[in-house]
Regions:
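Conserved strand-turn element in the central/C-terminal portion of the radical SAM core barrel
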Residues: 155-178, 199-201
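Short beta->alpha connector loops
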Residues: 107-111, 133, 172-175
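PAPS-dependent sulfotransferase catalytic core
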Residues: 208-221, 225
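Short, electropositive alpha-helical surface patch
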Residues: 86, 90-94, 131, 176-195
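Hydrophobic anchor at the start of a short beta-strand
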Residues: 102, 165, 194
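Active-site and channel-lining beta-strand-loop segments
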Residues: 269-270
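Conserved alpha-helical substructure of the radical SAM core
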Residues: 1-126, 137, 141-149, 153, ...
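Structural beta-sheet core signal
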Residues: 104, 129, 167-169
Length: 270
């Protein structure tokens, strides 16, 4: 028999999925929130800029309710949850008052290392970071306006403090032959799990056209292989140069510099 919402709630098996901010620092061309035709890769004009406050969250979800929830997925269809100014306090409220687990999905190129260290000290939190390249150029091809080295610095700060980091990588043609290299890089900076997913945003053909940050025409290309699982990619030794796989010396220097970045939350995208 199909279980209803109330059945899961009463059993303590309900999993919550929340979108707590429509703000985002990135400008991914195939994202639902991105205006890819007018230039600048800003948000669509019809999308209101809103975010939940801690007080709104506490009013909506009492401590009694928290204790009936198995887990929280704090994601973002139309924004990045780490752009929410009260995200840490919301997570702290959940963790302090229940045994619920929390998973946060983010591009990771937001906040400074000190903030991520603080988040990592909260028990029961996992974060999924978006890493799609081994260089800034490769990362920025889709994850526009993000900084690979800042993401890696934040991920390392989070995991060094005790947090668990996972990485999700969206596959396009520009990164399809670098997946194992990306995985190796992420694991050097604290990731314990690496998942890849072929982009499903090519609705009208193998290219998505857009106008970039500088007003120039550009396009994304769909991956031309089958990436349902890692085994279908082929022999990793034939794809990855393992002589350069484990050190990433130049990247390490840039990650160290990014670790000292200031918190840029005052300049939220509008």
């Amino acid at each position: 028999m199909e279980q209803k919402f109330i059945d899961l709630l009463e059993k303590g098996e309900l999993k919550m999925w929340l979108d707590i901010s429509t703000y985002c620092n990135a400008g991914c061309p195939a994202c639902h929130r991105t205006d890819r035709f007018r230039g600048g890769l800003h948000h669509e004009k019809w999308l209101p800029m809103v975010q939940w406050s801690l007080e709104q969250f506490k009013k909506a979800y009492s401590i009694e309710f928290l204790n009936q929830i198995k887990s929280w997925e704090i994601c973002g269809t139309f924004g990045d949850p780490v752009m929410n100014k009260d995200l840490y306090e919301i997570c702290e409220y959940i963790i302090t008052n229940s045994d619920s687990k929390i998973n946060v999905d983010t591009n990771g190129s937001i906040r400074n290392a000190a903030w991520w260290t603080k988040l990592g000290k909260l028990p029961g939190i996992e974060v999924d970071f978006a890493v799609e390249g081994t260089t800034q150029e490769m990362q920025n091809y889709y994850r526009r306006k993000t900084n690979l080295y800042k993401i890696l610095a934040n991920m390392k700060a989070f995991t060094d403090a005790g947090g668990r980091a996972n990485v999700f990588c969206v596959i396009h043609k520009h990164n399809q032959n670098h997946l194992f290299e990306i995985e190796a890089l992420c694991k050097e900076y604290g990731a314990t799990k690496f998942d890849w997913y072929e982009s499903n945003r090519f609705y009208h053909g193998p290219r998505v056209h857009f106008m970039d940050e500088n007003g120039n025409q550009d396009y994304l290309e769909q991956a031309d292989g089958n990436y349902e699982s890692p085994s279908e990619i082929g022999n990793k030794d034939g794809i990855v140069d393992y002589k350069s796989r484990t050190k990433f010396q130049k990247i390490a220097q840039k990650v160290l510099a990014a670790n000292n970045d200031v918190d840029e939350m005052e300049s939220m995208e509008t």
